[in-house]
Amino acid sequence: MTFSIDGQDVDLKNYVLINKIDYGSSMTKTHTIKWKWPYFGEYDDAADFINKNITINVEATGRQAGNDLLTTIKNKAVLDNINSTYVNNTTPGIDLSLAPSNTNGKGVYILNGTENNTYPIYYYRGNVNDNNLIYANYCWKIVRTTETGGIKIVYNGVPTNGKCSNTGTNSQLDTKSAFNSASSSITYTSLTSVGYMYGDKILIAEREKYKTHLEDLGTSKYTETLAGSSITRTRHNQNAYSSAVKNIVDTWYKENILTNFSGMLEDTIWCNDRALSTGTYSIDNFDSNTYFAYAGRDRLVTSTTPSLTCSRDIDKFTVSKSNGNGDLEYPVGLLTADEITYAGVGWFGYSSDSYLATGLRFWVMTPSRYVKVSNEQHVFDYNAERLGNDGVSNAYGVRPSVSLKNGVDILSGNGTEDNPYIVKP
């Protein structure tokens, strides 16, 4: 509120905080304002206001009910286990073993089994063009919502004249990265190199030791250089040091998000599922096979049964210990192979008909297998048009992912590439 006395503006202001609630279409509200005199500043004598006309100008800011991002997504979503506008299968619902299409999913879907939760999981699938967003002056694609009503988004480059139509290298960070690089604490042949964070250097001949290591929930103090700074922290022994790709992600976050934009983010779980396969390609059967597999490979290659549940608490990467392992410095990570499968990027036989398609490879954070002939661990990646897996030493694109807090509002836009959502807290 600003004031004038007999038409003369004065340097006197007052602010009224109205509860953050939705008033609906009617915005008429009555509020009582009281001042105490003398007032600090130029007008410190109440006599100055006697027999004068005082004009109060009110500027109100707010939002229309239902204009928050979560509600906008919710209003578009349909169940994924029924036939709908872009789902028409003999067995009703989306078939995740097949590529997305006009008859197998294109839009926003409610994950079956979560529809009655306080915050159901909504996810985008297929060649959609209504999940584009600008946050922290960068373009992002909305991937899915979280169990707390947050909104997980993935990096998609820099806006051009307010538009977000990036593909190829423009959709990734400038620096490509190996998932893990050889150093004094790790090698490409170490079984622990599939970790987004990793512990001891353990070779294939020591695989019994590796199985024991994966059960180690102990902690110790570790020192490493992360995002250009030396830090010493107590971490789980399995998560002592940051992988090469994590260092790239954390450095970018520190330089571009931390200072001005981190308040809009939630501390969600980033799942680096290191659970071992219990099937034919288990680590115990390695001598008679060409590789041993992780549980993610069983879910996404042997069958197509993606999951958004992280089975091992030690693999739930978070900043806080209240909802995960507490070993992260910043609330940022990579997508999982399961998440991009829901988005429409699956194993062999898929096409590039997904909003995540960029024409170039980029890392996700789900371990796949250890290959005997190359003596190297493999992690899943987006392989130009489908889900692939490659050795951790390969340098591929990096697309950081963050999760916006529940309650983020849409300032403008409709989510298209030409008119992306602009969001505010």
Each model region followed by its residue ranges:
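Residues that cap or initiate secondary-structure elements
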Residues: D9, Y39-G41, G62-G66, P159, ...
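Short, solvent-exposed loop/turn motifs
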Residues: D9-D11, Y43, C139, R386
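C-terminal, structured domain-capping segment
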Residues: L17-L70
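Surface-exposed interaction patch
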Residues: M1-L12
